[in-house]
Amino acid sequence: MDVKIGVLALQGDVAEHITAFQQVLDTIPSVVGSVVEVREAAQIPSLDAIAIPGGESTTISRLIEKNRMHEVLTGFQGGIFATCAGMVLMAKSVEDPRICPLGLIDMEVDRNAFGRQRESFEADIPVQGLDAPFHAVFIRAPVVRSVGAEATVLATIDQGIVAVLQGKHMALSFHPELAGDLRLHRLFLTGLGIV
């Protein structure tokens, strides 16, 4: 099976997500896979999945609009793996009017819920679908305040929901690409039938 995964290369941990997804694909004998940087809307329809990495959500939202990617992303038939700022963009509701969310996951997100850089932290958290806790890196992370009936909560911490799944889409408020642990990238691809 040929698989092509894209990583939205507008801002954030692009190289780290490319490496993580390629490492997972390389462990699947039946898959010939590639992971590419996505800089243009025309690249998106040919992908099986796309990652929206963390960064600054207002900047990424503006660049998505500038590069005419919003409509292509909302109509994308593959799965979307979104982390940190990517989670904010996937929401139906965001409190910041500068962000034009994609509305692909029925959730309300509080961006930068953990505020300043010094409020960033790491924690081992249980995640539905994983057999052991995941070491999560939270950097000025968002928190999900509520989810609709179509969304499944995968992980919570005291401050709120930090991992959500809806259909083919997974959104995480933390940075799995910085943990050195491929289980969430693998879990996402498993949900798409790739693993």
From Swiss-Prot:
Its EC number is 4.3.3.6, 3.5.1.2. GO terms for molecular function: glutaminase activity; pyridoxal 5'-phosphate synthase (glutamine hydrolysing) activity. It catalyses: aldehydo-D-ribose 5-phosphate + D-glyceraldehyde 3-phosphate + L-glutamine = pyridoxal 5'-phosphate + L-glutamate + phosphate + 3 H2O + H(+); L-glutamine + H2O = L-glutamate + NH4(+). It comes from the Archaea. One of its GO terms (cellular component) is glutaminase complex. Pfam families: SNO. The keyword Hydrolase applies. Transmembrane segments: none annotated. Signal peptide: none annotated. In the presence of PdxS, forms a dodecamer of heterodimers. Only shows activity in the heterodimer. Belongs to the glutaminase PdxT/SNO family. Catalyzes the hydrolysis of glutamine to glutamate and ammonia as part of the biosynthesis of pyridoxal 5'-phosphate. The resulting ammonia molecule is channeled to the active site of PdxS. This is Pyridoxal 5'-phosphate synthase subunit PdxT. It comes from Methanosphaerula palustris (strain ATCC BAA-1556 / DSM 19958 / E1-9c). The lineage of its organism: Archaea, Methanobacteriati, Methanobacteriota, Stenosarchaea group, Methanomicrobia.
